[in-house]
């Protein structure tokens, strides 16, 4: 489910907003956001929701271990190294296993390399580095250990940034999970920002993208120097408005 899709704009977001504002108290509201985030993720990758939950549980337990280690630096460093290493190995397996396997075949002079069918889970880079940020912050003492697993789950899996980022440091987002301020003016500002971003994506980025695709589809002999430079300019604008939106 994309933020620019009709399903998100006309169904998911309005339903979430209604349920959120009807929910009493911060704990219930946070539970609504957490459930919505997992549903949002499962829309595109239902089989990998378990991987997100496993990542949350794993980093939660190692966070507790680092906290219980207290002043024992060696134990804290060992827990940090194992936790960060496991996170990066998981990410590396999905992203680079075939690359390193092919490299090994090449180095050993073997033939017949067949890539393994390993689907890359959506957003795994973002939620993995979010988890690493949490572990790094509590190791450095920037923030205390999060003893409430559901709050940590919100930080790692929050739907506005789990699919395409940005990666937000734990010490920046944690105060908003536990004690965020809300007002009509802030909600209105958020709606305006969302509408502006949606317009940049749907109107400008998509428009420039359609023109670029049509030009690149022309025969090579029809692509003069001026046309190529014009297309490069349009493509730059497409990328700008896509990321800006």
What are these regions (language model features)?
Residues 1-244:
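Membrane-embedded transmembrane alpha-helical bundles that form the catalytic cores
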């Amino acid at each position: 489910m994309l933020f620019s899709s009709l399903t998100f704009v006309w169904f998911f977001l309005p339903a979430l907003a209604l349920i959120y504002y009807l929910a009493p108290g911060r704990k219930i509201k946070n539970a609504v956001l957490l459930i919505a985030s997992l549903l949002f993720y499962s829309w595109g990758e239902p089989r990998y929701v378990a991987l997100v939950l496993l990542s949350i549980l794993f980093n939660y337990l190692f966070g507790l271990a680092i906290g219980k280690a207290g002043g024992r630096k060696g134990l804290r460093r060992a827990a940090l190294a194992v936790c960060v290493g496991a996170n990066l190995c998981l990410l590396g397996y999905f992203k680079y296993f075939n690359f390193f396997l092919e490299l090994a075949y090449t180095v050993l002079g073997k033939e017949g390399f067949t890539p393994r069918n390993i689907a890359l889970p959506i957003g795994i880079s973002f939620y993995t580095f979010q988890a690493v940020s949490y572990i790094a912050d509590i190791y450095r003492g920037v923030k205390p250990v999060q003893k409430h697993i559901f709050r940590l789950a919100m930080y790692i899996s929050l739907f506005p940034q789990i699919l395409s980022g940005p990666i937000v440091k734990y010490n920046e987002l944690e105060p908003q999970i536990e004690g965020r301020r809300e007002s009509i003016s802030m909600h209105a500002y958020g709606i305006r920002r969302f509408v502006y971003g949606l317009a940049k994506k749907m109107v400008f980025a998509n428009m420039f993208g359609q023109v670029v695709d049509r030009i690149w589809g022309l025969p090579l002999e029809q692509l003069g120097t001026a046309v190529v430079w014009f297309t490069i300019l349009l493509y730059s604008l497409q990328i700008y408005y896509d990321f800006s939106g």
